[in-house]
Design a protein with these regions (language model features):
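Short Lys/Arg-enriched alpha/beta "domain-start" segment
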Residues: 1-33
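Interdomain "pre-motor" coupling segment immediately N-terminal to P-loop NTPase/helicase cores
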Residues: 24-75
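Conserved pre-motif I regulatory segment
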Residues: 43, 69-111
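Walker A/P-loop
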Residues: 103-129, 134-136
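Hydrophobic positions in the central parallel beta-sheet of the AAA+
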Residues: 110, 135, 175-177, 190, ...
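Conserved helix-turn-beta segment of the N-terminal RecA-like "Helicase ATP-binding" lobe
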Residues: 141-166
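Conserved motor-coupling elements within RecA-like helicase/translocase cores
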Residues: 165-175
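SF2 helicase catalytic motif II
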Residues: 180-181, 188-219
Length: 219
């Protein structure tokens, strides 16, 4: 087992019931029955496969098959000068960032009330990890908001953009990418191999049939 940019990789020979796995990872989103009857809501897979391997969501793979033994997702840190954090974490935010960074960096969901500083927490976490970071957004309003916050809290960071035909990602510290572009555009597999941290704003959108196609291109 290994962690790759496409997800948790497991050999098909190590899967006792491939059909059961495929069924478990073919999902149907919740839509209130007042709008659409459940049986008419289409299903879609949240896995990838090749001739020899299945690529499944990271935590599903760990839960079912154990901790991965190798990772191709180790990304070197960039120069600290780009990650100077111009601000301070409030006392209420400290447990949030600590839960991500200690005892060692890992992933999760930042859950704070409106105005609680989720964006600031994410940028602080990025400043501590010091790896190329991509922020996924689904609107130009959020894109502009993130760019403003990056300039304010990481004033020396080099900011990149992914939107439409614009793919400005080389030698960038924080990239703000449109989910629509990344999920729907055909991109070379190596496009985002330099990314070490993925931040998803409004993360409840990422499970949709279209937007879920973005994650295997990034993580």
């Amino acid at each position: 087992m290994a962690l790759t940019i496409h997800g948790y990789r497991v050999s098909k020979t190590d899967i006792p019931n491939l059909t059961k796995l495929q069924t478990a990872l073919t999902v149907r989103p919740y839509v209130p029955a007042v709008f659409v009857k459940p049986q008419f809501v289409p299903k879609y897979p949240v896995f990838k496969e090749s001739e020899k391997y299945m690529y499944v969501p990271k935590h599903y793979g760990i839960q079912e098959y154990g901790q991965y033994g190798a990772s191709t997702r180790d990304v070197p840190q960039t120069d600290a000068k780009y990650w100077e954090f111009a601000g301070a974490i409030r006392p209420a935010q400290q447990p949030v960032v600590d839960s991500f960074l200690k005892p060692e960096p890992h992933d999760g969901i930042i859950s704070l009330q409106t105005g609680g500083g989720k964006t600031v927490c994410a940028l602080y976490i990025a400043s501590q990890l010091r790896v190329p970071t991509i922020v996924l957004v689904n609107s130009t309003f959020l894109r502009d908001q993130w760019v403003d916050r990056i300039k304010a809290f990481l004033p020396h960071a080099r900011i990149g953009t992914v939107q439409g035909e614009t793919m400005d990602i080389e030698d960038k510290d924080v990239i703000v990418g449109m989910l629509q572009t990344i999920s729907m555009k055909e991109l070379p597999p190596s496009t985002f191999t330099s990314i070490g941290l993925v931040v998803v704003d409004e993360c409840h959108h990422i499970a949709s049939e279209a937007f879920s196609q973005a994650i295997p291109k990034l993580t």
